[in-house]
Amino acid sequence: MRFSLSSCKWRLKGTERYVPIQGDTMETGRAMKGLTPWIDCQVPGGVALALYRAGWIEHPYFGMNSLKAEWIEHRWWMYETTFRKPMLEGTRFSLVFHGVDYDALIYLNNQFLGEHVGMYDAFSFDITDTFLEAETLKLVVILKDAPDEMGQVGYTSETQTQKSRFNYKWDFGTRLVNLGIWKDVEIIAEEACALRDLHVRTDVTDEGTGQVIASGAVEGRGEDLEVRLEVRLDQELCAAARLPVGNGRFCGMAEIPRPELWWPNGAGAQPLYDVRLVLHSADRRLDTADFRQGIRRLRFVPNENSPADALPYTYEINGKRIYIKGVNMTPLDHIYGDIPEERYAATLRAAAAMNVNMIRVWGGGIFEKECFYNLCDELGILVWQEFIQSSSGIDNIPSVKPEFLRLLEKSSRYAASTLRNYTSLAAWSGGNELMKNKSDPVGYDHPNIALLKRIVEETNPEHFFYPTSASGPSFRQADTPGISHDVHGEWEYAGNPKHYEKYGNADHLFNSEFGSSGVSGTRTAMRVLPEKSWVPVSVAENADWRFRGDWWCSFDRDTQIFGQLKDLPEFVSASQWIQAESIRFMVEANRRRAFHSSGSLIWQFNEPWPNITCTCLYTYYDEAKMGYFWAKDAFKPFHVSLDYRTLNPMGEFVGSLWLSRDDCAAGETAVLHWEALAMDGRVLFCGTGEMALPGVHSTRCMDLRFPVPHETVYALRVSARCGEQRDSSIYFFSTEETNIYRPYLRLPAPELKTEKIEESPGVETWRVTNQGASAALHIHCLERSDQWLTLPEEDFFTLFPGESRTVSVSFRERFRYGFDEYADVRAEGKPDVVFIPFPLKQMLP
């Protein structure tokens, strides 16, 4: 039985260091009052939000206000709650903390229970005597000031803690170091014997039989102990087994002859079986543990034509190779203890809607909350989980300090022993961008990495362990063939034509981090920037922009391509276009090489605070950028793409049409078509063909060659049809030598007609028609009231004169949380949806 203390009334007080321990002054004997009075707070939660709610700090995400909140990390903080003893049945009672950030002193009814250092591993105290004797319980948690740890720039070899590093300042966030009780606190009642160290996993035999395999330990002694394993699907018992306990351990399995298999997103369904372990002594039930498991077979196989010394980067699920279409994720917020589950759900569902089938949980962040992994199980999103280590720029060599290794082993062993029970977990990595010297990725022989490898082998050997990401041997794509296995980069558009030459000729096996920057929407600017900074500007010339986007200034890039940008809406339009163009080409180029290349993980999906410019695809305020939708298209199960080497070919256009299919069936015939289009819709050149498809993921279907049109700009649309599957993609070119995309900013204004043609709970269907004489580029769906969160099925699409598109728009009431909860206004009426062509003309249409 369990009692969560999150339902209790908590309060919080800030003090100088050591004041809570001394209590009274030496000179006067009077109680020291502390820095703040007692204020209300919530658990789980963090200190910063409690202070904001109480009026002690300004909104830290507006302007440069986070600078005014940096004092928080330098103080001690007392959490306190008093509550009546809950009614719990058992013989042993434990006080369990699932996550405290970071160094905590624990007191119960004025008795010191102990100190705990570390934010990732749960810890507990036996409180049986106190619980049985007292009717009222008073719990005090004293958090010491945050340790002095590295931000993004520093020395990895000097790392001393297992605290999340990103909020000590990273390129995508500010410095706002979290302190708090960030996970639940419980009182757990148990009998004389209890289940411990549980490991539940699944597999599928060559004959197709599903296996649910369970093992663990039993703490305590009892007679005739056994563990009963039950497996159900939709409440129907599918399999059961009795597992005897010997020497305090048990292990066994239940088999399901014809299981419903779990597949990654896009490859099939994600049925989850309910697995229950019940500890019995004779016929007496002593303890129970419940899990949800998808039955699947996970294997790691070499890439096609990979070097002999390469690690396996191809993921095989249920006997089928899965091309990885992934993203990297940062924590959702600096105040990660205050993130509601609905925020996790909105973010991960948006990732799944983008056709994502893998998320890399980045090592500079956190081991995520339980709800994150549950959602990944439900949505079919595989997890590449990193241990909490990251590069630091000046040196990236993993720390071997004895105290650090002790903390690393403690937190990593706990994470490996708990996260192994999620179906979505696929692989582990030692951390982000760890090196053995200045430039070469670290290997298994480094003592830090060897420690982590041993932990994974001991706790969940069914998951592969990579020494780091990128695991090399070359960190970036190298000019020398054959040494670019798992690489990182690039993180920015490389320019025209260099970007296309570089990625079009790459030979890496896996691309676990790459991306491009783009300015966030005008709505973000209005929320976080003072009005004087609502202008297109370089970060070098504006402190507000520099404070929240220093590394990712796209101003020079975008003005080189588009020329002078007259206002912020136009800057947003131009910047997001180049971000989308950059990422789409990289994703498509990688996929065209499948399965020599087995996947792409875009940096990055989200951001933990609202940047004005960043490499994210999905902003802090739940707005999907153009790059989100262009990557979604490139990740489609059936996708046609164009391979090219420049945006402004001279004399003759040369390219090729490719078809990528998750279903690699041989013998099907594809019908292919391409057309070069003027902006008024005239077909300048075109071609059609058919091809019997081989049984491979990506196929070069047609070569294109035609004289460059006498137009300043033109588009090339490619399409493919194979049975019921069809797809089309559009690419934009120029004949200009400088400011090559400037003519796109000056096209005649299109005339759009929009009508809502269907409506159901949470979904509206719209028909958008271009009634004008010129192309309507990158038509964007926007909800104007800011009371609804919308996610169109497709967005930033182009219509030539006379063309129509039917668009399904999902919506739900926008939720506010954290520092933005003050704006919690319930939505009234219906979403105010508009469709706006490129470029944006106003801050808010």
Set out the residue ranges of the language-model regions:
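Accessory beta-strand-rich segments of carbohydrate-active enzymes
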Residues: 3-5, 11-20, 46-54, 69, ...
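Substrate-binding clefts and catalytic carboxylate motifs of secreted carbohydrate-active enzymes
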Residues: 12-20, 42, 177-180, 428, ...
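Active-site-adjacent substrate/metal-binding segments within catalytic domains
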Residues: 54-84, 89-96, 101-108, 114-117, ...
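Beta-strand-rich binding/interaction modules
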Residues: 106-108, 209-244, 652-692, 699-702, ...
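Extended acidic/polar, glycine-enriched regions
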Residues: 132-136, 215-304
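Active-site region of glycoside hydrolase catalytic domains
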Residues: 196-198, 213, 287, 294, ...
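Intrinsically disordered, low-complexity Pro/Gly/Ser/Thr-rich segments with frequent PxxP/GP/PP motifs
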Residues: 242-260, 682-711, 788-814
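Terminal connector regions
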Residues: 281-289, 705-745, 812-845
